[in-house]
Amino acid sequence: MDKYTSRYHKFYDEVVVPKLMKELEIKNIMECPKLEKIIVNMGVGEATQNSKLIDAAMADLTIITGQKPLLRKAKKSEAGFKLREGMPIGAKVTLRKERMYDFLDRLVNVVLPRVRDFEGVPSNSFDGRGNYSVGLRDQLVFPEIDFDKVEKLLGMSITMVSSAKTDEEGRALLKAFGMPFKK
């Protein structure tokens, strides 16, 4: 049985790596930056009042990523937010290997173009080590989500962790994948 290789994984091997080696003047193929994981996080602060919201967030993340999310709980109590330690406040999925490449493919080619008034993702959201984070205002930009079944619009943050050592390397990697940065 042949192992499944996603379209973007093949694209990385055949197009992105040679392009990055030339652009970043890398001699050894193992030095070429690569994506290690993509973390999709949904913070649901209103879950303190309405516990059904966390279930909706978990279901939406499962549909979007194809993987069961991890329930995130409050680390300590905070009276100002009516929050007790151990209360569920979010959901998180860590994507690796083929699911990661499939998700990136859908994000770049389907989801981001569906965002209203989209002019590109901000190019200043790098962390100094080549990792990139972008936020989405609602989950409806994903075609898998049924508009009629959504109770509340929930935003999410998507973090792409790469082996790049600098922001320039990380930007070059994501640009080679087709990430539409603002001019």
Curated annotation (Swiss-Prot):
Pfam assignment, any one: Ribosomal_L5
GO biological process: translation
Gene3D superfamilies: 3.30.1440.10
Alphabetically ordered keywords of this record: Ribonucleoprotein, Ribosomal protein, RNA-binding, rRNA-binding, tRNA-binding
UniProt GO molecular function: RNA binding; rRNA binding; structural constituent of ribosome; tRNA binding
A GO cellular-component term linked to this record: cytosolic large ribosomal subunit
Top-level taxon of the source organism: Bacteria
PANTHER family reported for this sequence: 60S RIBOSOMAL PROTEIN L11-RELATED
Protein name: Large ribosomal subunit protein uL5
Organism whose genome encodes this protein: Fusobacterium nucleatum subsp. nucleatum (strain ATCC 25586 / DSM 15643 / BCRC 10681 / CIP 101130 / JCM 8532 / KCTC 2640 / LMG 13131 / VPI 4355)
Primary gene name: rplE
